[in-house]
Amino acid sequence: MYLPTLAASASLLVGVAHGYASPGACSGACNIHDPALIRRESDGKYFRFSTGNKISYASASSIEGPWTAIGSVLPGGSSIDLDGNDDLWAPDVQLVNGVYYVLYSVSTFGSQNSAIGLATSDTMDLNTWTDHGSTGIRSDSSKPYNAIDGNLFQDDSGTWYMNFGSFWNDIYQAQMKSPPTAVASSSYQIAYQPAGEHAVEGAYLYKYGNYYYLFFSEGKCCGYDSSRPATGEEYKIKVCRSTTATGNFVDANGVSCTSGGGTIVLESHDNVYGPGGQGVFTDPTLGPVLYYHYVDTTIGYADSQKLFGWNVLDFSSGWPVV
């Protein structure tokens, strides 16, 4: 999620691939920030959630669209008693035992007074969401992390985890109760960029084959229309992997993700600038799909002009390639 007052650290590693495919097609409501994507089991309809408008969301018959705006998940804001509870950020959506879970972040720019909340619905239809308030993952200035950008993940044993964090000491993980409405354990660090402003956030964990892939965004995410960073310091998507969901993530060069490791999956190219805020979705036709927001430099650099992007991922090398 965005902390536009903070400068980004420079990218330290080259990606597996240097030539990137253009984003997949998008029609309809395509302006977005911090997308989260899921497909409804009952009818195959796609739902896409995003920062803004108290978690705005849209639906479509395919990932390409046409996307139609639905409204807000929590039109009355969050019950969490923190500043920012009427301006919710960085959703994540998962299906848990037939119920759709949407995580959201409550915070204000540059603040560690943050919490990750939960809303649920059986159908994802408008006005069917129940706010459960805080998951128990919160932060203030006494914590080494910032409790935003939550991502739920279930490992092969059925255990649920929450990945979260932005800047400060970057990405943390905590085991969740089952069902995962509340935290069950203390948290531990799984990714850290020691250089610069520790500009890592937006973790998303995805299992493919024998590996758990930890995707994250690194760099300056926002405010490009008024203050663009030095070349290479804008948002980009990186990844580390592990044979366990709970740590020991390394990049393609063997560098630990807690020591600044991270292999580039997608960065600025052609008219695509600052891709990030990503997730990975298993499409029934396309297979693994990386989705994200980005600036189209032929349109404009404002946050309100950011677009929904997606690309099929190729894991044949053991690493995700766009």
Swiss-Prot record:
Span of the signal peptide: 1-19
Example of a GO cellular component annotation carried by this entry: extracellular region
Enzyme Commission number: 3.2.1.99
EC supergroup of this enzyme: hydrolase
Marked site positions, Important for catalytic activity, responsible for pKa modulation of the active site Glu and correct orientation of both the proton donor and substrate: D149
Active site: D34 (proton acceptor), E201 (proton donor)
One example GO MF annotation: arabinan endo-1,5-alpha-L-arabinosidase activity
Keywords noted in UniProt: Carbohydrate metabolism, Glycosidase, Hydrolase, Polysaccharide degradation, Secreted, Signal, Xylan degradation
Function: Endo-1,5-alpha-L-arabinanase involved in degradation of pectin. Its preferred substrate is linear 1,5-alpha-L-arabinan.
Family membership: Belongs to the glycosyl hydrolase 43 family.
Protein name per UniProt: Probable arabinan endo-1,5-alpha-L-arabinosidase A
Protein's organism: Emericella nidulans (strain FGSC A4 / ATCC 38163 / CBS 112.46 / NRRL 194 / M139) (Aspergillus nidulans)
Primary gene name: abnA
